[in-house]
């Protein structure tokens, strides 16, 4: 029998989806963000992030993206297209992000591989209808020229 050499431990990966929804309101391009409230070192913080979350064991990636977008923004039935995977080993180096995700998911999170989805939409009343209820909002994209 051959001895199997000791190897670096396998990662305990979590898979998440992030939804990048770009909207046009007739005047400006905007991105859909959600408010995130967290706590770090006993201090409450607020910031904004893309709608995203971990996937469930019984759903595929496309189903997860639609579910996450609906649960976090109330928006459904938009065409989401998978466009990139983010899997850097250092992605979870920001303790604030890891702590927030662990509290939200009630689970220990080590490494996260995120599949990003993109959608382009026309912003209308139907898309704006429930955003306040979900603490989501459209934020103008600012264009800057490279220095």
Regions found by a protein language model. Give the residues of each.
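Short, charged/polar micro-motifs that form catalytic or ligand-binding hotspots
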Residues: 9, 51-59, 103, 107
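Active-site cradle of extracellular carbohydrate-active enzymes
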Residues: 140
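Short connector loops at helix/strand junctions that flank enzyme active sites
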Residues: 14, 77, 110-114
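The catalytic Nudix box helix
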Residues: 50-86, 117
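N-terminal strand-loop-strand
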Residues: 4-48
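Active-site-adjacent beta-strand/loop module that shapes the phosphate/pyrophosphate-binding cleft
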Residues: 90-127
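Conserved small/polar residues in nucleotide/adenosyl-binding loops
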Residues: 143-147
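Short, charged, solvent-exposed linker or helix-capping segments at domain edges/interfaces
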Residues: 126-135
């Amino acid at each position: 029998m051959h001895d199997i050499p000791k190897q670096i431990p396998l990662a305990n990966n979590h898979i998440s989806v992030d939804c990048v929804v770009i909207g046009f309101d007739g005047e400006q391009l905007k991105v859909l963000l959600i408010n995130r409230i967290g706590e770090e070192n006993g201090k409450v913080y607020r910031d904004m992030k893309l709608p995203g979350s971990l996937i469930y064991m019984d759903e595929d990636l496309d189903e997860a993206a639609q579910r996450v977008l609906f649960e976090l923004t109330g928006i459904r039935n938009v065409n989401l297209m998978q466009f990139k995977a983010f899997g850097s080993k250092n992605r979870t180096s920001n303790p604030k992000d890891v702590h927030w995700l662990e509290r939200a998911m009630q689970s220990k999170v080590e490494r996260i591989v995120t599949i990003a989805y993109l959608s382009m939409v026309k912003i209308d009343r139907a898309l704006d209808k429930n955003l306040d209820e979900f603490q989501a909002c459209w934020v103008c994209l600012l264009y800057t020229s490279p220095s």
